[in-house]
């Protein structure tokens, strides 16, 4: 009787321990699931508030008009800004001349260049310039693409575009030149798919901008005013250099350029001036 009782007690203990183990495992799994759910929530970026979007759209409209007013773009060219809370999205106008852009023309795209809201309006064929740079440059919050004539010229003349004065310190020791032929042979020169955009982004590297042979150029920045300011002064630097091609030019040294660039972040005075000038337009 006593031995049977002991055997039963042993079985009971094993059953109890087994049941406790299952309960503990279940509790741990439940806690793990809860932690994963919380981590997933933290990975999902919060949506931009209506106030954030309204302010950002107003600045993006202003950026388009500033670029047109300063002669950086004409009927072609474009500027984008990264989404303020979701780095995998960006805002850009639909297919439209920059000086005509309004807040209603702004489209939100993901990094595959697909409209997030299903917008069916025509888009810029070269939107891949923006998406592919945003993919590899998390520091970049805004991008400008221009066809300014003197920028085009500096991409084909055989002379490097270098900083002539302190406002163009961001050019540094020179900007790389993207030659689409090296990867894609004879084309229409446009960046019309992700592969071409990726090749351009690779040429850009960590630079503040790049020239595009037979096409134009790009500038990048940490904000809209930063990329816009750089694009305006890139054009000015190119204009000055074109006037003295073939002559001896005393460019900024790399160290002078670095020190000058440190004092020209975001171009705040220019931005306020340019914005006031253009936003009086209808």
What are these model-derived regions, one by one?
Residues 1-11, 36:
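N-terminal secretory signal peptides
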Residues 11-17:
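N-terminal export leaders
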Residues 18-26, 38-282:
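Glycine-rich flexible loops
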Residues 30-31, 37:
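Boundary at the C-terminal end of the N-terminal hydrophobic targeting segment
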């Amino acid at each position: 009787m006593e031995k049977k009782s002991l055997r039963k007690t042993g079985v009971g203990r094993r059953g109890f321990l087994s049941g406790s183990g299952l309960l503990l495992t279940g509790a741990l799994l439940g806690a793990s699931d809860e932690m994963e759910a919380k981590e997933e929530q933290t990975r999902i970026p919060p949506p931009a508030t209506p106030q954030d979007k309204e302010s950002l759209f107003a600045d993006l409209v202003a950026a388009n008009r500033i670029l047109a007013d300063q002669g950086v773009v004409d009927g072609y060219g474009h500027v984008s800004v990264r989404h303020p809370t979701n780095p995998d999205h960006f805002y850009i106008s639909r297919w439209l001349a920059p000086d005509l852009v309004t807040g209603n023309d702004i489209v939100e795209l993901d990094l595959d260049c697909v409209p997030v809201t299903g917008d069916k309006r025509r888009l810029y064929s070269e939107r891949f310039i923006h998406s592919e740079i945003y993919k590899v440059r998390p520091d970049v919050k805004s991008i400008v693409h221009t066809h300014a004539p003197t920028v085009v010229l500096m991409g084909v003349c055989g002379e490097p575009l270098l900083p002539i004065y302190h406002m163009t310190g961001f050019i540094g020791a020179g900007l790389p030149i993207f030659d689409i032929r090296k990867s894609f042979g004879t084309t229409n020169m446009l960046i019309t798919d992700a592969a071409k955009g990726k090749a351009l982004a690779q040429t850009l590297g960590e630079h503040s901008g790049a020239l595009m042979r037979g096409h134009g150029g790009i500038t990048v920045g940490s904000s809209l005013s930063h990329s816009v300011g750089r694009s305006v002064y890139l054009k000015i630097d190119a204009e000055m250099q074109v006037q003295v091609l073939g002559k001896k030019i005393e460019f900024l040294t790399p160290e002078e350029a670095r020190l000058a660039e440190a004092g020209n972040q975001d171009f705040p005075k220019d931005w306020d001036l340019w914005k006031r000038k253009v936003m009086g337009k209808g």
